[in-house]
Design a protein with these regions (language model features):
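Conserved donor-nucleotide/metal-binding helix-loop-beta segment in metal-dependent transferases, i.e.
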Residues: 87, 103-122
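Conserved acidic residues
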Residues: 3, 44, 92, 121-122
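Short, glycine/polar-rich helix-capping loops at beta-to-alpha or helix-loop-helix junctions
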Residues: 50-56
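Short beta-strand-to-loop acidic/aromatic patch adjacent to the donor-nucleotide binding site
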Residues: 80-83, 90-102
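A short, conserved beta-strand element in the Rossmann-like catalytic core
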Residues: 54, 74, 102-103
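Conserved donor nucleotide-binding strand/loop of the catalytic core
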Residues: 60-76
Length: 122
């Protein structure tokens, strides 16, 4: 079963516009999240789904897979679903990691993936 960890990311936050590109220790926040997700041992793909060209270009410049989604995607789950349906048809499992989780533990994503692979009803 092929597994993708998708990081939905948007620029137009009401409380903190541009948060994904805000610098944290000299790097954009979204890059910290990508680095954590890439440490997942069970994921076949780590990618970002965004509706913003600035985020798209930044993520691409760091060599990560990134998918452009329409602005009509109102939630991160909508962005993940769009990317899955449009670009990742041969994947079976999708894990949603929010773009503002720079301290996300990759082992937790691996546990989720293992659970999903073991229990086909989930």
């Amino acid at each position: 079963m092929k597994t993708a960890v998708i990081i939905p990311s948007r620029y137009a936050s009401a409380r903190f516009p541009g948060k994904p590109l805000a610098l944290l220790k000299g790097k954009p926040l979204i890059l910290h999240v990508i680095e954590r997700v890439k440490k997942c041992k069970r994921a076949d793909l780590a990618a970002v789904a965004t509706d913003d060209k600035r985020i798209f270009d930044t993520v691409k410049s760091f060599g990560c897979e990134v998918f452009m989604t329409p602005a009509s995607c109102k939630s991160g789950t909508d962005r993940l679903a769009f990317a899955a349906q449009r670009h990742l048809k041969d994947y079976d499992i999708f894990v949603n990691v929010q773009g503002d989780e720079p301290l996300m533990d990759p082992a937790l994503a691996d546990l989720i993936i293992d659970s999903l692979k073991k229990n086909k009803k989930l």
